[in-house]
Amino acid sequence: MFSSSVELELFFIFVLVVLNGIFSGSEIAIVSARKVRLEQLAKRGNRKAKLALKLATAPNNFLSAVQIGITLIGILTGAVGGATVALRLAEFLDDIPLLAPYAGPLSISLLVGFITYLSLVVGELVPKRIALSHPEHIACGVAPAMHLVAQLTAPLVYLLGVSTDAVLRLFGITSKEASPITEEEIRVMIEQGAQAGMIDEAEQEMVERVFRLGDRPVKTLMTPRTAIAWLDVESDWEENQQEILDTPYSRFPVGRDSLDECLGFVRVKDILNSQWSGQKINLEEIVQPPLFVAENTRSLHVLEMFRASGTHLALITDEYGGIEGLVTLNDLIEAIVGSIPNDDEIQEPQIIQREDGSYLLDGLLPIDEFKEIFDIETLSNEEEGHYHTLGGFVIESLGKIPQSGDYFVSDTLRVEVVDMDGIRIDKVLVNQLPEDSSTTEEESETDN
């Protein structure tokens, strides 16, 4: 029915569609390939991976070359257009009485529909699906050919680039460099990796904590001054010895009458060495130089200071030079991996979820962890640095040192003080209220 010229024309159209598919698949593969994976392959000596990485790191020229190829293929496909095929198909339809009056338009419509279908399936969808399923492997496979195409079309790409920039300038648009990847984007990628099962939940939590550690001031991790176990050079050795025996620590700050007169810190190891050698214990002789850190120093920076100094303990100072607290290397590690209790330490959890869904929280709970529990973005006066713990948030919200039973409402949370340790907030009960709750902060203050 059809002559050899028709078959040749159909074959030529099919070849053009396949070439279009190669360009489309190559574009998707190189753009979506993970650069980290390509770098790993390139370091192992994979030359194709080096070419793919080169194309991926400078995508503008490569994408322009691909677009030139796809455009030329589209023009050639339209030029060939299957004119001979349409003519032969019209002659075939003329033999059918019912279709004879519409043979010409119908043959063109059928041919256009066939070429469109073939172009979409073979020239676009299938190659892109394949490229997305194995981007790095395919990117390495097509890199040599695409690199050659980019070199051959370089003059035309340059001309098109200059022309495009000129047109954009007419509209007052200037090209900008791609913004670097943000921390939030990394968080999303990690979350997606965890959902896909590629990253363990524990690994995800640790990475999230590392990000938080970079933002948290060291004050949020410190042991407050009132809870510091320290040794006084003016006290009898028996008193200092009992302080060491009563606590599980291996390092102690040393002061003279007060922590504000801090001389440094001593290691229990050095005390034992002096004692076992028969020497009289003199804390001033074995004291190590102290490391002082401002209260608003970022925790991650303190970790770097520990690494540089070889010290595992730092004293936190306020703006007046007074000792406000103490932080150790163990505190920073626990902020990343979670609580690590000592063998002889019975540690009460800071977060307890009760059967009714409410939470019993420690007053010293870092405010970042409180926000994470209830998925809160920001709290009142938090950015001003007025508080860093749940207890500080309660005092800020109530405007006074509370008593047991005092409470307030913040958004949909009812926050109640249930236990005080002197003037320190020990335990706080937090309930999630319904969103349509009519309870207001003003009503709670009236009740109090």
Curated annotation (Swiss-Prot):
GO molecular function: flavin adenine dinucleotide binding
Regions that span the bilayer: 11-31, 62-82, 106-126, 142-162
Compartments, as annotated in UniProt: Cell membrane
Domain CNNM transmembrane: 2-203
Cited InterPro entries: CBS_dom, CBS_dom_sf, CNNM, FAD-bd_PCMH-like_sf, FAD-bd_PCMH_sub2, Ion_transp-like_CBS, Transptr-assoc_dom, UPF0053_domain
Keyword Secreted on entry: no
Topology of this chain in the membrane: Multi-pass membrane protein
Signal sequence bounds: none
Any Gene Ontology CC annotation: plasma membrane
Superkingdom in the source lineage: Bacteria
Keywords: CBS domain, Cell membrane, Membrane, Repeat, Transmembrane, Transmembrane helix
Domain CBS: 222-281, 286-345
Primary site of residence: membrane
PANTHER family assigned: UPF0053 PROTEIN YRKA (PTHR43099:SF2)
Similarity-based family: Belongs to the UPF0053 family.
Name used for this protein in its record: UPF0053 protein sll0260
